[in-house]
From Swiss-Prot:
Residues 17-33 are mitochondrial matrix. The lineage of its organism: Eukaryota, Metazoa, Chordata, Craniata, Vertebrata. The keyword GTP-binding does not apply. The gene is COX7C. This is Cytochrome c oxidase subunit 7C, mitochondrial. The chain crosses the membrane at residues 34-60.
């Protein structure tokens, strides 16, 4: 009796918790606009790549 009610509860929870599915729906940013995505990825990866160079430049120019 208890097992059946638990099983019914878990299946009803799964049925009620439906999210959108498909490509690009399970990531925290939008992939609908490819140019905006390109700009955001360039900023994200470019800032990580450029940071050491700016740090070294700052250290070399510091008195």
């Amino acid at each position: 009796m208890l097992g059946q009610s638990i099983r019914r509860f878990t299946t009803s929870v799964v049925r009620r918790s439906h999210y959108e599915e498909g490509p690009g729906k399970n990531i925290p940013f939008s992939v609908e606009n490819k140019w905006r995505l390109l700009a955001m990825m360039t900023l994200f990866f470019g800032s990580g790549f450029a940071a050491p160079f700016f740090i070294v430049r700052h250290q070399l120019l510091k008195k």
